[in-house]
A protein has these predicted regions:
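Selective transmembrane helix interface/packing segments
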Residues: 1-179
Length: 179
């Protein structure tokens, strides 16, 4: 019972941190202005881990590889700790288990990225109806527009309603179904 609660806490806190690191990476890739309060919060939450790693892992091709590596390492640690708390026999599994665990962490990282895209798109849709002047809107707009823009060329507006977020939800759900 305690192991289940610890696993839940570990996965929740670990995944929240990984989402913050992924947000930071996406904000850099999509050139989101960092003067926004939400962007400053994400940077403040992740700086303690990203800055030291940046000294070791350089950026390449305009991408901050330190953020991606950090997200993968944290997810790897969460996977290992979760299996350890569930009494997985690491000693019997041998050295072949480590690449499998790393692959599982990579798949979970991709899954979290897709869920992040779904969440950001949902926030954008709700904010467009409720309060489009909130300081969060420019960040959410810049993070979701690269995914919605290509769909707008394919999906026409129906009665002045943009259905591309719905199409993006469906595409993301299909991606999550792929084994």
């Amino acid at each position: 019972m305690i192991a289940g609660a610890l696993t839940f806490l570990l996965q929740t806190l670990g995944n929240l941190f990984v989402i913050a690191v992924l947000l930071r990476f996406m904000m850099q890739v999509f050139r989101v202005p960092f003067r926004n309060p939400f962007a400053q919060f994400v940077v403040a939450v992740t700086d303690f881990a990203v800055k030291p790693l940046r000294r070791v892992v350089p950026g390449l091709f305009g991408l901050d590889w330190a953020c991606l590596l950090l997200a993968l390492l944290v997810e790897f640690a969460v996977v290992l700790a979760s299996y350890w708390l569930d009494d997985f026999p690491f000693g019997l599994a041998g050295a072949r288990v480590w690449p499998v665990m790393l692959g599982l962490a990579a798949v979970r990282l991709l899954s979290l990225t897709v869920y992040l895209i779904i969440g950001l798109t949902l926030v954008r849709a709700v904010l467009s109806w409720v309060n489009s002047d909130t300081p969060l809107m420019p960040v959410v707009y810049e993070l979701t527009e690269p995914f919605l823009r290509p769909l707008r060329r394919i999906v026409p507006m129906v009665a002045n309603v943009d259905l591309t977020p719905l199409v993006l939800f469906i595409v993301c759900q299909l991606v999550l179904m792929v084994p």
